[in-house]
Amino acid sequence: MMQDLRLILIVVGAIAIIALLLHGLWTSRKERSAVFRDRPVKRLKQERQDQDEPPLSERDEGVGEVRVTRVRHDDDAPLSRLASRVGEGERDDASDPLLADGFGQPVSNAPRAHREPPQIRSAEPAMPAREQVASDSDDMGGGDDDDPLLPAASRAAAPQTDYRSSAPAADAPAPAAESSVKAAQVPEKETVLVLHVAAHNGTVLSGEELLQSVLQAGFQFGEMNIFHRHLNPSGSGPVLFSLANMVKPGSFNPEDMADFTTPGISMFMMVPSYGDAHQNFKLMLQSAQRIADDCGGVVLDDERRMMTPQKLDGYKARIRQVLEANAGV
């Protein structure tokens, strides 16, 4: 018995739900057809009312406020509402006397607003028409900046800020700065290390003493008329570093060294070089110090300043960077 009653209730409930759905669909279609059927009539009535309205300059000062009546439409027809809105916006721009006289924007561009003809009230003081139009527009919440259907001239009147005016000028030097930074970050794959042996201020190095000290340090006279330090002191093997005159053109004449004087000499080596670059630089530094002691000079760095421990660390760092750059190839 209870199962039969439950089955009956389920059937009755299903029938009721189906009936409600059918009734809702029928009501929705009926309202939609009514909206589409009444819209041409409303448009024609609106055009006639706009044509019958006298210009604002011909109206009396006692014109009452313009009232706006909101008409709620069905939300199931967004495309039709958009088409209607565009059509009504174009007609309002062409026929509204308020726009023709230059008093501002249309009172309403939305399809939900229906404007009734003004009513003349003799007993009550009337507000100016311009203030009424502005107040009605504010009540409807339709800002000029938010409505895409407003005329282009009215949107152009609003102040606009160009945020692109100063940015290119400030960013113009950026490519050059970035290129210089990238160039500085690229490690060198070869470099030249230079040491100088210079005479004390106001003195010069004697050619005869210089030649004797250079030969004792293991240098051999060779190409480009300068001295070279080979792997073997006898002059065989690859060149490790070289010695030239500090004065241009930098060459020597071994046969004329007795009458030769110079303010100093320069020693240089290429990195990478044959063998261990660190050991080759150490040997070049020892040779420079020996020549300076023999000839009464001082050892200077590549900027012709006194050699310091910090500068020696800089030389070693340059050697290490070049070797690492070549090892990564």
From Swiss-Prot:
Record's protein name: Cell division protein ZipA
Annotated signal peptide: none
Residue ranges annotated as Periplasmic topological domain: 1-6
Keyword field contains Cytoplasm: no
TM helices/strands, residue ranges: 7-27
Assembly and interaction partners: Interacts with FtsZ via their C-terminal domains.
Family recorded in the similarity comment: Belongs to the ZipA family.
Function: Essential cell division protein that stabilizes the FtsZ protofilaments by cross-linking them and that serves as a cytoplasmic membrane anchor for the Z ring. Also required for the recruitment to the septal ring of downstream cell division proteins.
Any Pfam family matching the protein: ZipA_C
Gene Ontology cellular component terms for the protein in this record: cell division site; plasma membrane
Biased amino acid composition, Basic and acidic residues: 45-78
Compartments (UniProt record): Cell inner membrane
Listed Acidic residues bias regions: 136-148
Coiled coil: none
Region named Disordered: 45-183
GO process annotations (BP): division septum assembly; FtsZ-dependent cytokinesis
Protein's organism: Sodalis glossinidius (strain morsitans)
Highest classification ranks of the organism: Bacteria, Pseudomonadati, Pseudomonadota, Gammaproteobacteria, Enterobacterales
Keyword Cell inner membrane: yes
Segments on the Cytoplasmic face: 28-329
Lipid bilayer topology: Single-pass type I membrane protein
